[in-house]
Amino acid sequence: MIVLVAAGWTIWEHNRDPIAVLDKKPGTIIPIVDSTLISRFLSEEREYRHIKLSTENIDTIEAFISLPLIRYTPIMPVIIVLGGLEIGIHNFRYITEPGNNAIVIYQYPYKTDQWRNNSTLSQIPIVRRKIFEVPAQVLSLSDWIHQQSWSDTSRINVSGYSFGSFFVPAVYHLDNLKEHRLAPGVIAYGGVDIYQLLMTNIKKPSLPLKMLTSWFVATALYPVEPALHLPQMNNEFLIINGTLDDQIPKESWQELHRLVQEPKTIIILEEGHMHPRKPELTLKLVNISKKWLREKKVINP
C-alpha cells in the first residue's frame, strides 16, 4: 500500500505544471523596512540599504542594496544576487570595484538557524512552501526595482551562485512567460537532477535511507527542478562550473550545459565548490561574472 501511495504521489508531482506551482501573485506590496547606512566594505564608501517588502501572498521579501554615493548617471544597471544559504550584507565584501551599478543581495525567506531551533520533520512543509516562493519573490523584487528612480529598467539581471544557481532557471522561465524584462544572467556552480545532487551531498545515513530521503525531497521539490526550466529560458547566460567540485557531479553540470540554449558562454575552472572558507574562489567567480556582464553591456564599468 505504501509503495502504491509513493508511486502515485511521484507520478502526480512529475505531471504537475511547475509554472502553476511557482507563478504566485504577490498581491499588494508594502515596504515595511527601509534603513540606510554609509559604509566602506572594500575600496570605496557606498550607500547600503536594508529593505523588507510585505506581500499578501508570498511572505516578506528581504534584500540588501548597495548603491554608489557618487552617481555618474541618473539611472544604473542592477544585479540581483542569489547566493548561498548564509548570504547577507557581509557578502558585499566579495564584490570589488562595484562601479556605477546597484547590487541587490536577495535574502532567502527561510533562515538556516530555524533548522537548528525546530524539529526537522516539522519544518519540511514550511521549507517546501518557502522554496516554491523564491522565484516569485525574486521577480516581485525585480518589479519593485523597476519602480525605483535609480534603476535602469533595461539592465536588471539575476546572477545565481551555488544554492542560488538552482533558482535562476525557474526565475528566467517565469520572466520569459511574462514580459521578458530581465537582462542576461549568470549560473555559477549549478546542476540538474535534485535526486542525484542529494545523493552526492547527504553523507550520514545508510544507503537505503539516503536513497529514500533523496527520493522524498527531490519529489517534493520537483517543480523547481532546474532541468524543467533550463530549455525554456530565452536569454543569454554565463555558466561556470568546476572540475574538482565534490558537491555537483560532473554529469549534473554537463547536462545543465546541454539544456541551456544558445547563446551561452561556458567556463570550466579547475576548482572545487565555492564555500565561505574559500574567499579567493568567491572573488574569482565574482570577477569573472563582472567581466562577462561588462562585455555584454549588462553592467557599467
What are these regions (language model features)?
Residues G27-Y72:
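N-terminal cap/lid segment of alpha/beta-hydrolase-fold proteins
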Residues A63, P74-G84:
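Short beta-strand element of the alpha/beta-hydrolase
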Residues I87-E97, N101-A136, L197-T200:
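Cap/lid segment of the alpha/beta-hydrolase catalytic domain
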Residues S122-S162:
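Gly/Ser-rich "nucleophile elbow"/oxyanion-hole loop immediately N-terminal to the catalytic nucleophile
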Residues P169-T219, I268:
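Hydrolase active-site cap/lid region
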Residues M233, I239-N241, D245:
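Short beta-strand/loop motif that positions the catalytic acidic residue
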Residues N235, P249-R258:
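Short alpha-helix in the alpha/beta-hydrolase fold that links the catalytic acid
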Residues L269-T282:
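Histidine-bearing beta->alpha loop at or near hydrolase active sites
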